[in-house]
């Protein structure tokens, strides 16, 4: 796992026990999962808008910024649910080299 993700995961874990007024992340944990999910949704929409703007203008600065926000809030969500970023990286590694169509078909319930 990248050093940045490792360090960020450690900070997110530390903030779970911090006072809500001590950091933004601690305040999110204090507000609960619904607030965290709201932020993930908000950042998803902002990322989509930034992608459309980048496609039209060729300027990807906002796209990178909003994607970082989306990833960050997704990591907060995972942490709130007791999951580590490595679990997502492991899943991506598992999928590497698999046909996307075959992987999706394997998840479909039989009719």
UniProtKB/Swiss-Prot annotation:
SUPFAM superfamilies, per the entry: all-alpha NTP pyrophosphatases
Please state the pathway this protein functions in, per its UniProt record: Amino-acid biosynthesis; L-histidine biosynthesis; L-histidine from 5-phospho-alpha-D-ribose 1-diphosphate: step 2/9
- This protein's GO CC annotations: cytoplasm
Keywords from the UniProt entry: Amino-acid biosynthesis, ATP-binding, Cytoplasm, Histidine biosynthesis, Hydrolase, Nucleotide-binding
Spell out the molecular function terms from Gene Ontology.
ATP binding; phosphoribosyl-ATP diphosphatase activity
Q: Which GO terms describe its biological process?
A: L-histidine biosynthetic process
**Where is it predominantly found?**
cytoplasm
**UniProt-listed InterPro entries:** HisE, PRib-ATP_PPHydrolase-like
Reactions that this protein is recorded to catalyse: 1-(5-phospho-beta-D-ribosyl)-ATP + H2O = 1-(5-phospho-beta-D-ribosyl)-5'-AMP + diphosphate + H(+)
Q: What is its EC number?
A: 3.6.1.31
User: What Pfam families has UniProt attached to this entry?
Assistant: PRA-PH
Subcellular location, record wording: Cytoplasm
* Top EC class of this enzyme: hydrolase
Give the family, as the similarity comment puts it: Belongs to the PRA-PH family.
- Protein name per UniProt: Phosphoribosyl-ATP pyrophosphatase
What is the gene name? hisE
């Amino acid at each position: 796992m990248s050093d940045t993700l490792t360090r960020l995961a450690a900070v997110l874990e530390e903030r779970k026990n911090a006072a809500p007024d001590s950091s933004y992340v601690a305040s999110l944990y204090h507000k609960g999962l619904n607030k965290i999910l709201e932020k993930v949704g908000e950042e998803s929409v902002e990322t989509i808008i930034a992608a459309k703007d980048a496609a039209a203008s060729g300027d990807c600065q906002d796209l990178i910024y909003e994607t970082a926000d989306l990833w960050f809030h997704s990591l907060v969500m995972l942490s709130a649910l007791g999951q580590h970023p490595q679990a997502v990286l492991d899943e991506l590694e598992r999928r590497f080299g698999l046909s996307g169509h075959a992987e999706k078909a394997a998840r479909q319930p039989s009719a």
